[in-house]
Curated annotation (Swiss-Prot):
The modification Glycyl adenylate is found at residue 64. Gene3D superfamilies: 3.10.20.30. The keyword Nuclease does not apply. Pfam families: ThiS. This is Sulfur carrier protein ThiS. The modification 1-thioglycine is found at residue 64. The keyword Phosphoprotein applies. One of its GO terms (molecular function) is nucleotide binding.
C-alpha cells in the first residue's frame, strides 16, 4: 500500500506523476512530500511508487 494524504491506496507501480494527473492535481500550484522529501509540483520525480511510500500533496497559497 501507498499512503496518499493519510489514506492507504493500492498505487504500487504507478508513477507519482500519473497518480497526481489522475487526481486532477495542477502541478504548478502544489508541493509534494514523498517519504519526507519535498518537491515543488513541476519537479516531482517520475518514478514508480513502492509499497510503504508516503505521499502528501499540499496546495501552495499566496498571502498578502
Amino acid at each position: 500500500m501507498v499512503w496518499l494524504n493519510g489514506e492507504p491506496r493500492p498505487l504500487e507501480g504507478k508513477t507519482l506523476k500519473e497518480v497526481l494527473e489522475e487526481m486532477g492535481v495542477e502541478l504548478k500550484g502544489v508541493a509534494v512530500l514523498l517519504n519526507e522529501e519535498a518537491f515543488l509540483g513541476l519537479e516531482v520525480p517520475d518514478r514508480p511508487l513502492r509499497d510503504g511510500d508516503v505521499v502528501e500533496v499540499v496546495a501552495l497559497m499566496q498571502g498578502g
